[in-house]
């Protein structure tokens, strides 16, 4: 009888100055049989000593550290040992700019340190942290199929919780509008797309999975780099050419038609596909409000958020594009969108900006005839 060796566990180095946080992260990491704690240390110097003996597969890093701050340590890691890093911090107010800097320095993911006020929140936090750690290794291992989650999550809610489904209905011609959904790897991918767009780009509405407090700084940073205007969403904000609106962290974003144009709604509510904001919620609102006036783009990310409601967009007459596997950090959401029949075209990351502009031109030519 042939025996098969178990797949090696992903070794995680935890770096956090709080003993309580280290203990919490150890329990979370060890709850996933695909992960193991290599070491849990209080500062960057202890982490460096641990790494002289053994290199981890992923580092779970707090930014607020004694002696050497987390950003400085992250910069040194990327220069000397480019190991996947997941930043996990509770500093989402004054530290928000630092979080965006962490992404630019090469952190694979930035997540908020869980409050864990009840059992459900602890369970959801465990799933998010383990997913982030597992996703951080995807670019190295190039898995196209995510491994099954070992944790038993609570009920996975659909967009029906926020916006009831309805059959496709004809909608009047309006301005074109582009709806984009992204998750793991999306911050860098969105920067690549948005910085390639001219000021004449069609209106864009974006859901990027990020926690509360991160998206304002993310939008400001993109706004400083782009020819288009990039803003964090506010309720009833006008959607207009040359503007990209990014969903607030921890709030759903919906598209609403107003005469020949659009505004956005910012809503609280249940997690959909275990996310708030949810791509499915945005895409369903686009299917119902914009129909064939919309382009849906689903980009790199783990899981299936956006897949079901991208199919609704396509059924309502929208054009739809998925980022291709080769250019994704994690080929999860695009793969699921293809599987659900919601994708009209598959394109590499470096072609998405051109496709957005082509859509805008085609739609404008169609409406002026």
From Swiss-Prot:
Belongs to the CheB family. PROSITE patterns: CHEB, RESPONSE_REGULATORY. It comes from Cereibacter sphaeroides. The modification 4-aspartylphosphate is found at residue 62. Its EC number is 3.1.1.61, 3.5.1.44. Phosphorylated in vitro by CheA2, but not by CheA1. Phosphorylation of the N-terminal regulatory domain activates the methylesterase activity. One of its GO terms (biological process) is chemotaxis. Contains a C-terminal catalytic domain, and an N-terminal region which modulates catalytic activity. Residues 136-168 are annotated as: Disordered. Disulfide bonds: none annotated. It catalyses: [protein]-L-glutamate 5-O-methyl ester + H2O = L-glutamyl-[protein] + methanol + H(+); L-glutaminyl-[protein] + H2O = L-glutamyl-[protein] + NH4(+). The keyword Glycoprotein does not apply. It is found in: Cytoplasm. One of its GO terms (cellular component) is cytoplasm. This is Protein-glutamate methylesterase/protein-glutamine glutaminase of group 3 operon. Involved in chemotaxis. Part of a chemotaxis signal transduction system that modulates chemotaxis in response to various stimuli. Catalyzes the demethylation of specific methylglutamate residues introduced into the chemoreceptors (methyl-accepting chemotaxis proteins or MCP) by CheR. Also mediates the irreversible deamidation of specific glutamine residues to glutamic acid. Keywords: Chemotaxis, Cytoplasm, Hydrolase, Phosphoprotein. The keyword Cytoplasm applies.
């Amino acid at each position: 009888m042939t025996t098969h060796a178990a797949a090696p566990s992903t070794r995680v180095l935890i770096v956090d100055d709080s003993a309580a946080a280290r203990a919490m992260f150890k329990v979370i990491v060890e709850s996933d049989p695909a992960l193991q704690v290599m070491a849990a240390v209080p500062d960057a110097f202890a982490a460096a000593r641990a790494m002289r003996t053994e290199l981890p597969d992923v580092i779970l890093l707090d930014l607020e550290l004694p002696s050497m701050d987390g950003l400085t340590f992250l910069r040194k890691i990327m220069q000397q040992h480019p190991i996947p890093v997941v930043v996990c911090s509770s500093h989402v107010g004054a530290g928000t700019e630092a979080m965006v800097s962490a992404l630019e320095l090469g952190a694979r993911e930035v997540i908020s340190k869980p409050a864990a006020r009840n059992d459900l929140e602890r369970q959801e936090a465990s799933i998010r942290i383990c997913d982030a750690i597992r996703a951080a290794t995807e670019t190295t291992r190039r898995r196209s199929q995510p491994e099954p989650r070992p944790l038993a999550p609570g009920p996975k809610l659909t967009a029906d919780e926020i916006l009831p489904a309805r059959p496709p209905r004809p909608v009047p011609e309006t301005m074109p509008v582009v709806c984009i959904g992204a998750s793991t790897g999306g911050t860098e991918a969105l920067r690549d797309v948005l910085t390639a767009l001219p000021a004449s780009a069609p209106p864009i509405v974006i859901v990027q999975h990020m926690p509360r407090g991160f998206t304002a700084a993310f939008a400001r940073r993109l706004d400083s780099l782009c020819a288009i205007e990039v803003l964090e969403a506010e309720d009833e904000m006008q959607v207009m050419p040359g503007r990209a609106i990014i969903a607030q962290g921890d709030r759903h974003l919906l598209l609403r038609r107003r005469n020949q144009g659009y505004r956005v709604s910012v809503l609280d509510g249940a997690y959909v596909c275990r996310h708030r904001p949810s791509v499915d919620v945005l895409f369903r609102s686009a299917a119902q409000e914009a129909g064939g006036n919309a382009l849906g783009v689903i980009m790199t990310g783990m899981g299936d958020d956006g897949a079901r409601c991208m199919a609704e967009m396509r059924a309502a007459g929208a054009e739809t594009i998925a980022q291709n596997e080769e250019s994704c950090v994690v080929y999860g959401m695009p793969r699921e969108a293809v599987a659900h029949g919601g994708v009209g075209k598959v394109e590499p990351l470096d072609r998405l900006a051109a496709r957005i502009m082509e859509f805008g031109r085609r739609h404008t030519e169609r409406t002026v005839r």
